[in-house]
């Protein structure tokens, strides 16, 4: 994640929506219509740019499989621009596309650890790998003692 942006408008129509968000000053410098930006972990294509404000069209599959359809004006979203040659690649990479959302069904607390259990649709369980990585979008505080 490179930063947070604020939703300035969300125009929802049947099976389609347009998301407009204000990005921190200078954070989208040099970006062009057609560029890819990850918003809440979802790869979106820039359809319009007005300074530090970008627009994205969300198709029915994006609305179904992600949490983007639940956003409203003033919602905050995580964003990350596409990697470029020469950029530092730090941390752990997560690659792929968003196929669903999951709810936390249980949190097991031990003296030295926490195990978070997610409820995933049964039809997708065959794609869930032990010790694989998943991306999480959570309201603050992200983690609590």
What function would you assign to each model-found segment?
Residues 1-145:
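Conserved loop->alpha-helix
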